[in-house]
Amino acid sequence: HFYHLGAVYDLEASAEAMEKANITGTKGALEFAEAVNAGCFHLVSSIAAAGLYRGTFTEDMFEEAEELEHPYHRTKHDSEAMVRANGRIPFRVYRPGAVLGHSQTGFIDKIDGPYYFFKALQKLRESWPRSIPLVGIEGGYINVVPVDFVVDALVHLSHQPKLDGRCFHLTDPKVRRVGETLNVFARAAHAPEMAFRLDPKVFAMVPEPVTQSVQRSKPIQNVFNQLLRDLQVPRSVLQFVNYPTRFDSTATQKILDKAKIRVPALEDYAWRLWDYWERHLDPDLSIDRSLRGAVKGKVVMITGG
């Protein structure tokens, strides 16, 4: 068995970095696997290989991917295409959803998906009374899975006979929207929830000239960009808030069910993810709050008699 997990999953990474890791790296891994006569090449791809497909993307779909303009989507799709077209070595492809921390410990060494909004939830908890309802957006679809499920599923599937050439969605069969998912984490964080969530279709009713005028407004853009910086939300993440794709994992679930490997309910372990993030990954933990840290890199004028 040869497992290839090396990739760039950072949405903020440059297109060149993604090309080098996701495409050039996969090419090198394939060549090495052939050189050592590996029995099967196991590619850990991503649901990103579907691009921004509108509808339900099944495990036997690949070429149907749509809107691969973002380099992350494109390089994940292209690396998968390379493995499929190789023809000289058996392969299996695994497409995990957005990978979260361990469902039993909360441990994670890289943030993805909902983690980008944890700082915003934390600030809301500190400044907004839970008794006052919030209005938010329902958003598109989001599929999240804990890392321990991904590992258990990968190990089991890779050792089952007669599955070469297949693709497996390591995803949550429960369909969730972004707004619903953020509310789960809001409860875990003891932050106010979005009592009212607006469907994205509501904004489609706004006349296009009005939308374009707002988007081009320099003052509005400046305020919006400052808000993103304060909440530490990468701008690139926002394009996925209305993610249009649902993922079907029926075939994979049938295999995993026999081994009693199932995706745990997010509600059951979200508190562990939040607790671990707040104790270990919160960016504010690394801020130097001493006098030295407060004045470092600044020009300070001391006045007085």
Model-derived features: positions:
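Conserved Rossmann-fold NAD(P)-dependent oxidoreductase catalytic core, especially the SDR/UDP-sugar
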Residues: 3-6, 12-20, 24-71, 91-92, ...
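Conserved catalytic Lys-bearing alpha helix of Rossmann-like short-chain dehydrogenase/reductases
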Residues: 23-29, 75-83, 117, 150
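NAD(P)-dependent short-chain dehydrogenase/reductase
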Residues: 55-56, 69, 84-142, 147-152, ...
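Glycine-rich Rossmann NAD(P)(H)-binding loop
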Residues: 99-104, 134-141, 166-176, 184-187, ...
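Mid/C-terminal beta-alpha module of Rossmann-like enzyme folds, strongest
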Residues: 156-235, 254
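Amphipathic terminal alpha-helices
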Residues: 236-299
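Conserved N-terminal Rossmann-fold NAD(P)-binding element of oxidoreductases
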Residues: 300-304
